[in-house]
Amino acid sequence: LTDAIIGQMMEGITLPDFADIDIDKFDYTYKELKDGEDGIQRGGYPGQGFPAYAAHMGAKYKAMKEAEQRWENIEVLDADVVCVAYGISSRVCKEAVRKARAKGIKLGLIRLITAWPFPEKAFAEINPDCKGLLAVEMSIKGQMVPDIKLATKCNMPVYGYFSLDVVPDADVVVETAEKIIAGTCEEV
């Protein structure tokens, strides 16, 4: 999961070795067309009609949700505050975690790699004594907040640091974490 700023960066990267993936091992991936097929479904739903199609699609989405969640957890096991971020905001949060830990503040990060399926499993590893989650993203109101609340079953306070026109600042992330720990930050 990325954003325009990550897409325009010019630093060197190391890519993993190319690997062939057998897409046929998943029943929810694209299947190759047979000769004469055009891939267009005509005349309603095949087989048993819409109920069977809806059940098939429900099972397909469930399998994808289970198998395709992607994230990276950084220092969440003992964190008092855990940032949740993606794209350039996650890079800022990595720096904030480093700075906070140097100051003795237990800050962690869940870096989203996929937005859908939302990586709900990542939140299971959070310290149960965590004081709150800090959504850090370049948006007006925090598009991740509802997903974070759903992933935690609203059992953990969620706070936000949102910036629309500038890259978030690591020092502000640390300051916000300090306010959350002190109990002086307002939930979103």
Task: List PLM regions with ranges.
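Gly/Ser/Thr-rich loops at beta-strand to alpha-helix junctions
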Residues: 5-6, 86-92, 116, 139-143, ...
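Redox- and metal-dependent alpha/beta enzyme cores, enriched for Fe-S-associated oxidoreductases
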Residues: 70-106, 110, 116-122
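Short acidic, glycine/serine/threonine-rich loops at helix termini
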Residues: 7-15, 95, 122, 145-148, ...
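Structural signature of the thiamine diphosphate
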Residues: 1-21, 132, 138, 175-188
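Short, solvent-exposed amphipathic alpha-helical segments in soluble enzyme
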Residues: 14-18, 95-106, 124-128, 149-154
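Peripheral docking tails and interdomain loops at the edges
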Residues: 137-188
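Conformationally flexible catalytic loops at phosphate/diphosphate-handling active centers
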Residues: 1-73
